[in-house]
Amino acid sequence: MPIREIRHPLIRHKLGLMRRADISTKNFRELAQEVGALLTYEATKDLPLESYEIPGWCGPVQVEKIAGKKITVVPILRAGIGMLEGVLSLIPGAKVSAVGVARNEETLQAHTYLEKLVPEIDERLAMIIDPMLATGSSMVATIDLLKKAGCRDIRAMVLVAAPEGIAAVEQAHPDVTIYTASIDQKLNEHGYIIPGLGDAGDKIFGTKQKDS
């Protein structure tokens, strides 16, 4: 499984701002969208193109457009919603599927409680978005669901990834590429990424925050 850590200066700068303990909900939310957009740029660099002709100001002009499969963006609820607007700013024509996954705070295992997939999803490139790849259980559960629905071209974008989560996805789904802004050090005993961002969902939605 390719894991691609995107160390672009803009991403590094914005991620550094997101790590502040005293960051406001507004700023965290805006930065999550911005980094999500930058990751989308990298995750779509290899999409195929095809030429076609349009009427230009001086006559017919050959231009290019994205060819091949259509795209569905798959936010893992709820935190994945925090990256959605940034992703759609670059691919506004993409359809949105949604997968709700809850993690048991004691066992750290995930279970799926909601799936709203677009029609003919098996014919689309599925791009999963979730701010944190911690234990990997939510990501694995989502990929399991998408593959069961017929998806064969799946990519994932996360703001921060832990080595444990990367290993879990690699073991279960070695064909899925993960794009991340940072590979962090480890998980703590509560399954939170160190140094991480804290609870990304709480910070995006302004609910009670937990320690990272």
Swiss-Prot record:
InterPro entries: PRibTrfase_dom, PRTase-like, Upp_B, UPRTase/APRTase, Ura_phspho_trans. The keyword Transferase applies. One of its GO terms (biological process) is uracil salvage. Keywords: Allosteric enzyme, Glycosyltransferase, GTP-binding, Magnesium, Nucleotide-binding, Transferase. 5-phospho-alpha-D-ribose 1-diphosphate binds at residues 78, 103, 130-138, 199. Pathway: Pyrimidine metabolism; UMP biosynthesis via salvage pathway; UMP from uracil: step 1/1. It is an enzyme of class 2 (transferase). Uracil binds at residues 193, 198-200. GO terms for molecular function: GTP binding; magnesium ion binding; uracil phosphoribosyltransferase activity. Pfam families: UPRTase. Binds 1 Mg(2+) ion per subunit. The magnesium is bound as Mg-PRPP. It catalyses: UMP + diphosphate = 5-phospho-alpha-D-ribose 1-diphosphate + uracil. SUPFAM superfamilies: PRTase-like. It comes from the Bacteria. Belongs to the UPRTase family. Catalyzes the conversion of uracil and 5-phospho-alpha-D-ribose 1-diphosphate (PRPP) to UMP and diphosphate. PANTHER family: ADENINE PHOSPHORIBOSYLTRANSFERASE, URACIL PHOSPHORIBOSYLTRANSFERASE, CHLOROPLASTIC. NCBIfam families: PRK00129.1, upp. This is Uracil phosphoribosyltransferase. It comes from Pseudomonas fluorescens (strain ATCC BAA-477 / NRRL B-23932 / Pf-5). The gene is upp.
